[in-house]
């Protein structure tokens, strides 16, 4: 680990005049500039942000020697704020499989309670700790943590795994592709070179060079909404809850967000007037005056970082262009309400990693990658619709919508039934892949929570442990009462396909490959009937439930590994 990386870890955060202290990684001349023999890499990832690093870590864990190219030499955005801070349970489950969850949990702030105010009146609240959508997982509903920390932990984990070559100060300038490979032209401080890969994943963000050169249409619009981020430390700490104001009296009746992050820093987002100048709203004296209006003139704070931001919403027409696939902000951009942007990119990577490995291993047809486009583009469009409704609630674009919004707020002040209509952001949740070509029964396409069980093969304690051990194989989970001859038939099937079979029992039994699930939570999550086999994908999505019959299961696997065409 570089010395400046260690120093930055110890310093944590510094004052406003220097912003956040981030690690710096050196440029190392790649083999292509050292005169080594030319090689074709299995995968090249363009962009070392949250999505690119998640995918790189996933591939490293699966033993794929990929290359990651990033045009910067650090994590986060130099000179920028905390950026994305709110990591949802599904993302935390992914990080658990990748081996970085414990660091994130130790550094971040867990929360489950949210409150929304209109003026001084609380008009909506929730506690996700008691929600059935969250209460089965070993991971909490949400953890707040500055984005650069998460990226930092991923870089460390990638280095620890040792399969992926992360190349800093490497800017991709051009892309060309043939029937069997993609060639990237890369500019570095040491010169330019060409890099060839079987597959390229573009995670380079909304200013992607690749998608422009490949001519992939993008649809969207820039919002007029303007905000100012203020990352501050309080000497006296408020509760670790998500508080939002629709009409904050201390912000000229505009919206405000308040979240706690790591290192005792709070993230305050203030909605600004559309005609305010960016430089003016971010001046320290203006920010301090704004904070004094909210917390009182004697508030004792330290400004860590301040900056304005605007946002846009857009989505590519397709997420695959030949051998180039798009993920994260290169594929879709959405407003920040509900923490759906960064979490969506993490889940893009989770969806894509195992599919790439199956294709590279020859166990699946390349058409399997078309399912990434189908599933994740539908998820992006759902997220855009959801965040779009929040945007319209917070900033009604027409007089009629403002009347409706004001009526909802007035009703919510007095009547509980109206509180569910208050919309300051529907929080990130895993998408359901209703129309996925990989679904093999009506139960398919649903995310399964990371439940714990009493005992399992190999010492696995959770479902994430189990899929991690299975690598890119599909899990076939059946009742422990299955007849021995049928079990042996499934084992023979597992020798022909990427499949791992496991039995589920409520009570201890003397059989191999048995999960002891006394509470029945795993069976509940899988909706597993007696005589059924649940097929669980490596990304903890249910492909479906089929009869415990090797012909039916093999047909389902062929359908999955052909991208729905089998």
Locations of regions flagged by a protein language model:
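Helical substrate-recognition/capping region of FAD-dependent monooxygenase/halogenase enzymes
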Residues: 1-42, 46, 54-62, 66, ...
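Active-site-adjacent segment of FAD-dependent monooxygenases/related oxidoreductases
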Residues: 9, 79-157
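FAD/FMN-dependent oxidoreductases across multiple families
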Residues: 20-22, 262, 278-344, 364, ...
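Core beta-strand elements of the Rossmann-like FAD/NAD(P) dinucleotide-binding domain
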Residues: 39-41, 190-199
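Glycine-rich Rossmann-fold phosphate-binding loop(s) that bind the pyrophosphate
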Residues: 48-50, 147
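Glycine-rich FAD pyrophosphate-binding loop
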Residues: 60-82
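Conserved FAD-binding catalytic core of PHBH/FMO-like flavoproteins
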Residues: 122, 156, 199, 203-311
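A conserved short coil-to-beta-strand element within the FAD-binding core of flavoproteins
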Residues: 168-182
């Amino acid at each position: 680990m570089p010395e400046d990386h260690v120093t930055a870890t110890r310093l944590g955060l510094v004052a406003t005049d220097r912003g956040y202290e981030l690690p710096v990684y050196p440029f190392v001349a790649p083999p292509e500039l050292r005169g080594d023999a030319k090689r074709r890499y299995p995968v090249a990832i363009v962009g070392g942000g949250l999505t690119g690093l998640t995918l790189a870590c996933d591939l490293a864990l699966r033993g794929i020697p990929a290359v990651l190219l990033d045009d910067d030499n650090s994590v986060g955005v130099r000179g920028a704020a905390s950026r994305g801070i709110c990591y949802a349970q599904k993302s935390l489950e992914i990080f658990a499989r990748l081996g970085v969850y414990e660091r994130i949990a130790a550094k971040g702030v867990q929360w489950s309670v949210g409150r929304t105010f209109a003026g001084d009146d609380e008009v909506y609240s929730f506690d996700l700790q008691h929600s059935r959508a969250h209460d089965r997982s070993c991971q909490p509903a949400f953890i707040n943590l500055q984005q650069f920390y998460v990226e930092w932990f991923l870089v460390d984990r990638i280095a620890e795994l040792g399969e992926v070559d992360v190349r800093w100060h490497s800017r991709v300038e051009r892309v060309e592709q043939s029937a069997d490979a993609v060639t990237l032209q890369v500019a570095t401080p040491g010169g330019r070179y060409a890099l060839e890969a079987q597959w390229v994943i573009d995670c380079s963000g909304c200013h992607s060079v690749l998608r422009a050169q490949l001519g992939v249409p993008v649809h969207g619009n820039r919002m007029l909404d303007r905000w100012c981020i203020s990352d501050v430390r309080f000497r006296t700490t408020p509760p670790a809850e998500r508080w939002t104001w629709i009409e904050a009296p201390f912000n000229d009746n505009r919206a405000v967000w308040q979240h706690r992050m790591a290192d005792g820093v709070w993230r305050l987002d203030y909605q600004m007037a559309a005609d305010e100048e960016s430089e003016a709203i971010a001046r320290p004296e203006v920010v301090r005056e704004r904070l004094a209006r909210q917390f009182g003139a004697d508030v004792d704070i330290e400004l860590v970082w301040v900056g304005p931001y605007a946002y846009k919403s857009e989505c590519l027409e397709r997420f695959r262009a030949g051998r180039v696939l798009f993920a994260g902000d290169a594929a879709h951009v959405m407003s920040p309400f509900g923490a759906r942007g960064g979490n969506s990119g993490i889940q893009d990577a989770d969806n894509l990693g195992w599919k790439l490995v199956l294709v590279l291993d020859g166990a699946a047809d390349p058409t399997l990658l078309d399912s990434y486009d189908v599933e994740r583009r539908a998820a992006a469009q759902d997220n855009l619709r959801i965040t779009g409704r929040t945007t319209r609630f917070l900033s009604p674009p027409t007089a009629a919508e403002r009347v409706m919004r004001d009526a909802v707020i007035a009703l919510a002040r007095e009547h509980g039934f109206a509180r569910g209509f208050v919309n300051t952001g529907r929080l990130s949740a895993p998408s359901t892949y209703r129309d996925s070509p990989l679904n093999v029964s009506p139960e398919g396409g649903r995310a399964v929570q990371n439940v714990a069980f009493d005992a399992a093969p190999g010492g696995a304690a959770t479902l994430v442990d189990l899929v991690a051990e299975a690598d890119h194989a599909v899990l076939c989970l059946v009742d422990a009462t299955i007849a021995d001859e049928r079990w042996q038939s499934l084992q023979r099937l597992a020798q022909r396909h990427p499949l791992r079979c496991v039995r589920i029992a409520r009570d201890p039994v003397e059989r191999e490959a048995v999960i002891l699930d006394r509470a029945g939570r795993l069976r509940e999550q899988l909706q597993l009937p007696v005589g059924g086999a649940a097929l669980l994908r490596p990304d903890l999505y249910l492909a479906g439930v089929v009869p415990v019959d090797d012909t039916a299961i093999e047909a389902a696997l062929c359908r999955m590994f052909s991208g729905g065409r089998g």
